[in-house]
Amino acid sequence: METLLPDIRYALRMLRKSRGLTIVALLTLALGIGANTAIFSVVNAVLLRPLPYSDSERLVFLSESSQQIPDMSISMANFDDWRSTNTVFEGMAAYRTQNVVLTGTGEPERLRERQMTASFFPTLGVRPILGRVIAQEEDKVGAERVVLLGDGFWTRRFGRDPNVLGRKLILDGEAYTVIGVLPNQEMHGLWRRTDVFTSLWRQEDQMGGAARRGEHPGMYAMARLKSGISIEKARAEMKRIAGGLAQKYPDTNRGTSAETIPLLQAYVEDVRPPLLFLLVAVGLVLLIACGNIANLLLARGTQRYRELAVRRALGAGNWRLIRQSLTESLVLSLLGSALGLLLAGWLTKGFASLYYASVPRLDETSMDRTVLLFTLGLSILTGLFFGILPALQATRADVHQALQEGGRTGAVGASGRLRNILITAEVALSLVLLAGAGLMSKSLYLLLRADGGFNPAHVLTASFSLPDAAY
């Protein structure tokens, strides 16, 4: 530790002395580490960060499955049996999403509606910031129509007016009474984009035959595990219950089972492979950058061969030379990481401002503590990775040869071989990336050129939201 500060000062002097090399290395590191940090911030927000609900690891997603359809919506009658016979969940709720049209006040507006059972918010552990949630007596056919507002819709349509409770909203031609407003921070993740929340069973009188066993009206379920119950045990029990229903109702349930997976996994499983692929791709780019920087440092080490030999002659041991060289590499890497953080911060803000329905939680991307720790660890590993070969090269300085031959000849052979190996590795990694990019480009080209069976020229599409009661 006594020599750490002198080593850092010496490293900074050497970096100033080789300004061209330093600038190239810093820019290379900034791009490599910045890209890795930016992509990891997305991976962290989408895949790693827990859902913003109490004990979210106990929340699971439930669906039905068959040999033909591995993940399908749930029959309402089956859901009733699941909820009444299971022993592994302390709460279970069903829900579905659709679009409704708001009329009656101001301009008509198409809204995203979540229809759910009364157990939905208690199961999640979410409480409204105004009013209350749907009561059990309101969660049945013939009950009064009530609605909760999402924070975004409340802000956009009512200017966060606290007197919104009790107002009437006309949704698809039916009057609903506003009973509550949900907090924005609790709705991040799964249902942040939902505008209004209504009773699912209240809609049963509008579903007709869709409410019968064997019908699947786009409804799914989620549940909260009891304390101490593993997801494996819950999965086994749900399959047992589904098997019993298949025997009891063979006409509608034969060949169907139940699927139980963590709620977060269900939400992000479609985007996990492409995000991890992107993380691997930018990791390969950083490896190539490390190879480039290692080559630069090896070339500079050849020029410093006589200096290193003299230091050995004055008593510097191998470990001392390695430590000095690694310190210089780590200082360079940390400086490059600082620049990379600036780039990553700019990219992260761009990601957070985007909204893609196919990438959930993308707007939650941020430079939090996990991302900063990742960047710090990555910068240290990067510095060690591209600095180890130049550090080992420093121990090869031969005192007698350097003094007799003027300094550089003895280092050329070993250094040249190492640099050739690095160049070969860089080319190999570059070919892997180019091949992957080429395959993806070809797939996109074929997809765009695929024959849809009709001529799409001058053809437009339109969608209409029709009320369930009338259609």
Predicted regions and their residues:
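Hydrophobic alpha-helical transmembrane segments that constitute the membrane-spanning cores
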Residues: 40, 331-352, 434-437
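Membrane-proximal extracellular/periplasmic loop immediately following the first transmembrane helix
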Residues: 51-99, 216-222, 447, 451-471
